[in-house]
């Protein structure tokens, strides 16, 4: 599995689920992370920008536990004031650290972070409604050492298109998908992923299939064999062996119908 920059910067577009961990029970955050991991999310963005140290330490502990439970990469968003804060965040196993523009530390701290971990480990989140940035303004952060930008509260205007197509930064769009369309956001050549909480109670694979039908390449497990080609058991089902995907341990024999096979 690709967990670093190779995972994100592959040609395929991604759907990343975000989880707001502020004022949330850690066990609930962990359960939701596991649910997304099982149900088709390509990655997670888990954040808690609370400023007090006790809350940060509890969040970091929770993030380390989540990293051991899930099989998809995750980004971490946390309050960072100095290099040590960033180091603790990335040592949770997170593939990227996301810092809000309003909470950006001093430039010297950013340079120390990127000197140690690389430009690809650091992202800045910008509210495009409150503080629109064009390509040149985005590139200032790239030149500072930040490789990725997360753009939220966006409108799909010509100005937005020019900004994302013109910047040197890797572009991720964070959106609730209430006004904007998933396929449209992913159709921008420079948009590498959409970060959303829209699929907390919805079928991610169904959305991926719809996006793929529109010609957008996105990770999707698809069988090359049609259900009709299988020799069925007397009950009209396909016999299957169920294994633990981590250990390959055989758990049981089961039967699958066409609806389950096509999911």
Predicted features along the sequence, with ranges:
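Catalytic cores of alpha/beta
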Residues: 76, 80-93, 136-141, 160-193
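Alpha-helix-loop-beta-strand connector modules within alpha/beta enzyme cores
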Residues: 54-77, 109-128, 156-178
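A general structural detector for well-ordered alpha-helical segments in enzyme core domains, enriched
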Residues: 32, 59-66, 85, 106-113, ...
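General detector of folded, globular domains
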Residues: 18, 32, 40-41, 57, ...
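Flexible "arm" and connector segments at domain edges
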Residues: 135-144, 182-193, 198-263
């Amino acid at each position: 599995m690709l967990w670093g920059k190779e995972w994100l910067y592959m040609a395929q577009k991604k759907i990343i689920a975000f989880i707001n961990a502020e004022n949330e029970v850690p066990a609930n955050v962990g359960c939701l992370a596991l649910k997304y991991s099982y149900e088709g999310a390509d990655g997670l963005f888990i954040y808690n920008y609370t400023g007090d140290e006790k809350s940060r330490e509890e969040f970091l502990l929770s993030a380390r536990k989540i990293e051991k439970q899930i099989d998809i990469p995750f980004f971490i968003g946390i309050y960072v004031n100095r290099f040590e804060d960033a180091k603790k965040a990335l040592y949770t196993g997170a593939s990227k650290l996301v810092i809000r523009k309003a909470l950006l530390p001093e430039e010297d701290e950013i340079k120390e972070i990127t000197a140690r971990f690389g430009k690809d480990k650091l992202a800045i989140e910008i509210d495009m409604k409150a503080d629109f940035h064009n390509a040149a303004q985005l590139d200032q952060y790239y030149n500072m050492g930040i490789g990725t930008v997360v753009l939220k509260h966006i409108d799909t205007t010509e100005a937005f298109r020019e900004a994302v197509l013109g910047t040197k930064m890797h572009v991720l769009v964070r959106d609730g998908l209430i006004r904007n369309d998933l396929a449209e956001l992913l159709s921008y050549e420079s948009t590498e992923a959409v970060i959303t909480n829209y699929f907390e109670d919805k079928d991610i694979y169904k959305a991926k299939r719809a996006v793929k039908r529109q010609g957008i390449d996105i990770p999707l497990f698809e069988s090359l064999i049609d259900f009709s080609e299988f020799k069925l058991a007397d009950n009209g089902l396909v016999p299957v062996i169920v294994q633990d995907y981590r250990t390959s341990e055989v758990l049981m024999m089961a039967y699958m119908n066409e609806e389950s096979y096509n999911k």
